[in-house]
Regions:
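Solvent-exposed hydroxyl-ligand-binding patches built from regularly spaced Ser/Thr
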Residues: 25-218
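Sec-dependent N-terminal signal peptides of Gram-positive bacterial secreted proteins and lipoproteins
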Residues: 2-23
Length: 218
């Protein structure tokens, strides 16, 4: 009886060790941002939400976001049981499929609530980004910055189809600094177009905002 109990205890301990080892071997793949706040300098283009509260006519407060990116090689190296952090949550990997234009995890987000769809960047097929509902690219908040306006600011608002091709929309508009804030507010009131990080990029040159571009899917 004692020998049996000793054998049973050893078997249980072995199972526990195997379980712990399996848990330790499971790894988490996290995205990296395409933007480094500390390295922005005087000339840069970033994804940002334009804050229009207040009456400041000389500049804008920007909430800056970095696009969440993944290495294709890192994604393909994932195994069942591993985890990937995408769209604000961890997903346990069950299967990975290479599809046209990218990689689907667990069937992709269109087929499965627990799925993740990663798309290759147009200019870099070895780098992937994650898309959320309505094809918004998943991004991470990096910090806030105040930037003054240049003497003239180009505002571009375009509607895009599901593949990112322009459908037309509003012509480019060149505004004076005092006209920018009212224009952004009016765009929301008239057309419900928000200048948020999901669809907005802001260009700064020589330390001043020169262009704000919105690409939205109607």
């Amino acid at each position: 009886m004692k020998k049996f109990l000793a054998f049973l205890t050893a078997a249980v301990l072995a199972c526990c060790v195997l379980s712990v080892c399996a848990a330790e071997e499971s790894r988490l793949l996290e995205p990296y941002a395409d933007t480094d706040m500390e390295a922005l300098g005087q000339d840069y283009t970033v994804r940002a939400t334009c804050l229009t509260d207040g009456t400041d006519e000389k500049g804008l407060d920007l909430m800056i976001f970095g696009k969440d990116l993944y290495s294709r090689a890192d994604v393909l190296a994932l195994r069942p049981g591993d985890r990937i952090f995408a769209n604000g949550a961890e997903t346990v990997v069950e299967k990975i499929d290479e599809v046209e234009g990218g990689i689907d995890i667990n069937g992709g987000y269109l087929e499965n609530n627990d799925g993740v769809s990663l798309f290759a960047l147009p200019d870099d097929p070895d780098t992937l980004c994650s898309c959320m509902e309505d094809d918004y690219i998943s991004s991470t908040f990096l910090g806030e910055a105040y930037e003054p306006f240049a003497e003239q600011i180009r505002i571009s608002v375009y509607s895009m189809d599901e593949e990112g091709n322009p459908l037309g929309g509003y012509d480019e508009t060149v505004l004076r600094p005092e006209e920018v804030r009212p224009f952004i507010q009016r765009m929301y009131e008239d057309s419900y177009i928000e200048f948020n990080y999901s669809v907005t990029t802001v260009t700064v040159q020589n330390g001043a905002i020169t262009e704000i571009r919105v690409d939205y899917a109607p």
